[in-house]
Amino acid sequence: MKKITFLFYFLATFYSSAQGYSTGTISLNNAAGVAMTAKIDVNTLVTLTLTGPSNRWFALGFGASSMTAGTDVVVCHANTVALPSFDRYLTGFAAPVSDGTQHWTVTSNTVSGSVRTIIATRALNTGDANDYTFSSNPNPIS
C-alpha cells in the first residue's frame, strides 16, 4: 500500500509540475522612484502579475530587448481605476499603440499605499500578429 501511495504522489507531482511554469517574481527597475516587479505563470493561460507605482504609468514588453516595432506591450496607467487599452504594441520609438483587440483580461487592479498590483490573464497564443506568443515550455521571453 505504501508503494502505491508513493507512486500516486510521485506521478501526481510529476504531471502537475509538467503542466506549467513560472518566472517567479522578478524585480525590474528601481530608477527614478519606479520600482516594478513582474511574475509570469504559464499553464493553460498566461497569468501576469505586475506591481508598480500607483501614481505613474509603467509598462512591460515581451519578446524584444529595445523599442522594436511590433513589440507586444502591456501598459498600466497612473491614477486610474480602469485600465483602458492595457494591451498595446510598439510602432518604434514612440508611445505604444492600443491593440485593436484587448486579449488581456484584467482580473485584479488594486492599490495599496503607493503600489499598484495588476493581475491579468490571456491565452498563450491569441492568433493576433501584434501579440507575443507564449510557449507552453519554459523559454526566455527577452
Predicted features, each with a name:
Residues 1-22:
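Bacterial Sec-dependent N-terminal signal peptides
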Residues 19-142:
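Extracellular-facing/secreted segment signature in eukaryotic proteins
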